[in-house]
């Protein structure tokens, strides 16, 4: 009889231990999880521009309009591509279906100032935008401003300036995605 009680006690102890471990697996520490969409989510995505017919302004530091080398960087297609890639990195699948929840990126300001200061060339990018998420009849939005200054010893080239623009957008979107806007919008 004593052996039977010992055996069932052992099973009970082991059983509790297994349940305890399973509960730990079911409820992990939420503070250590990344703030990303946990499953692929289909969205409609668009970049809009309220800066008339051009995406932004390019000026040198003296104030004169200048900078043909930046024009490729400032194309709406390039912006759409960079932002779409960032959204994909966060687990979104982009679709043209208008019935899906939508993410809209509205550019409210984009300017690049370039010029020579002392012995180095300076590129200043100033980007301001509003990100809107529309889902189930509600609209959540967040506005951000970002300035990125880069100094080089050689005159800037198209590829280098496109990298500055892409990095700026990427950093800015990371800031936005670290807020709860997207998580709340798609719950």
Model-derived features: where do they sit?
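Sec-exported extracytoplasmic/periplasmic mature domains
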Residues: 84-92, 173, 177-182
């Amino acid at each position: 009889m004593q052996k039977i009680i010992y055996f069932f006690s052992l099973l009970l102890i082991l059983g509790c231990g297994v349940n305890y471990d399973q509960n730990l697996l079911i409820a992990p520490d939420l503070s250590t999880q990344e703030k990303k969409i946990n499953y692929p989510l289909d969205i409609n995505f668009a970049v809009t521009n309220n800066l008339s017919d051009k995406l932004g302004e390019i000026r040198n530091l003296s104030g004169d309009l200048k900078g043909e080398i930046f024009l490729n960087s400032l194309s709406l297609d390039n912006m759409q591509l960079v932002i779409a890639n960032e959204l994909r990195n966060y687990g979104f699948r982009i679709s043209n279906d208008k019935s899906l929840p939508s993410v809209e990126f509205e550019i409210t300001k984009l300017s690049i100032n370039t010029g020579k200061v002392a012995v180095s060339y300076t590129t200043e990018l100033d980007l301001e935008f509003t990100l809107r998420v529309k889902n189930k009849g509600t609209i959540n939005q967040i506005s951000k401003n970002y300035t990125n200054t880069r100094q080089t010893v050689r005159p800037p080239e198209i590829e280098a300036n496109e990298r500055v623009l892409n990095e700026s957008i990427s950093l800015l979107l990371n800031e936005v995605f670290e807020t709860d806007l997207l998580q709340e919008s798609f719950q």
